[in-house]
Curated annotation (Swiss-Prot):
The active site is at residue 129. One of its GO terms (molecular function) is phospholipid:diacylglycerol acyltransferase activity. One of its GO terms (biological process) is triglyceride biosynthetic process. The keyword rRNA-binding does not apply. This is DGAT1/2-independent enzyme synthesizing storage lipids. It catalyses: a 1,2-diacylglycerol + a 1,2-diacyl-sn-glycero-3-phosphocholine = a triacylglycerol + a 1-acyl-sn-glycero-3-phosphocholine; a 1-O-alkyl-2-acyl-sn-glycero-3-phosphocholine + a 1,2-diacylglycerol = a 1-O-alkyl-sn-glycero-3-phosphocholine + a triacylglycerol; a 2-acylglycerol + an acyl-CoA = a 1,2-diacylglycerol + CoA; an acyl-CoA + a 1,2-diacyl-sn-glycerol = a triacyl-sn-glycerol + CoA. InterPro entries: Plipid/glycerol_acylTrfase. GO terms for cellular component: endoplasmic reticulum membrane. Its main location: endoplasmic reticulum. It comes from the Eukaryota. Glycans are attached at residue 5. Its EC number is 2.3.1.-, 2.3.1.20, 2.3.1.22. The keyword Cytoplasm does not apply.
Amino acid sequence: MIDNNQTCAAGQDSVPYVTCMIYVLEEWLGVEQLEDYLNFANHLLWVFTPLILLILPYFTIFLLYLTIIFLHIYKRKNVLKEAYSHNLWDGARKTVATLWDGHAAVWHGYEVHGMEKIPEGAALIIFYHGAIPIDFYYFMAKIFIQKGRTCRVVADHFVFKIPGFSLLLDVFCALHGPREKCVEILRSGHLLAISPGGVREALLSDETYNIIWGNRKGFAQVAIDAKVPIIPMFTQNIREGFRSLGGTRLFKWLYEKFRYPFAPMYGGFPVKLRTFLGDPIPYDPKVTAEELAEKTKNAVQALIDKHQRIPGNIRSALLDRFHKEQKAH
């Protein structure tokens, strides 16, 4: 009786090429019914893919907690040095920035375009808020590594209530306002970042990349009071990396009621992420806060129109990993 490999070797047309390859692999690996194993593995992949996509966003939170654990260890190790050094946390910041920069390069092929537009002095960076602002974490890492500067950021109040986050927020200079504090930071020559859309934009915006700022113009008044330029910022494909289900009526109501992002997220896709910094909007004492806010919104929208395909597509965003630069759409 002729075995499977002999049948393939005989060149019989009735035996498909793929089937022959399976027979060869069965003999080479010393297993039987390899095709059944492959079918079973494919079935497992089909079953668990939705679960994996729901877990990956929380892996980012896991990385944040690993960062916090590292900072606590670092703090204990250097407890005696703290009384003698004003730069205790610089080593920790550099280590964390290097780790996040490595993650950005491997998982997203992360790039920043327009870094030269950031001045040596103070500036207010205004950015579009993704479902998870992982692009801003990467951007802060780049700023610290390349320029040795910490970019302060205004975070939502709920972030300060997350257990364990206080040390992380302190080390990386996050604040929740008020306006006077933001002006003070800018007048001291620091970089400050604000997303006017905040959590609402994170939850309610989608693959159409609609900007949800409402009538917010406080950030513009901050720039006017501090007499600093505004730099618009947008990250290509940020909505394809992570998606939010916050657009449903239930989760909208929950957010408006409790001001807490209850909406689940999915994703963690290794899409290409490119952060683009627009031309600085210079300080002009003749411009009102309303006019400056509208001008800034238009600048961010211009970056979206130039660099982002609408609607966003996860498959295309994955393929962007293999292109040097995406065409303007």
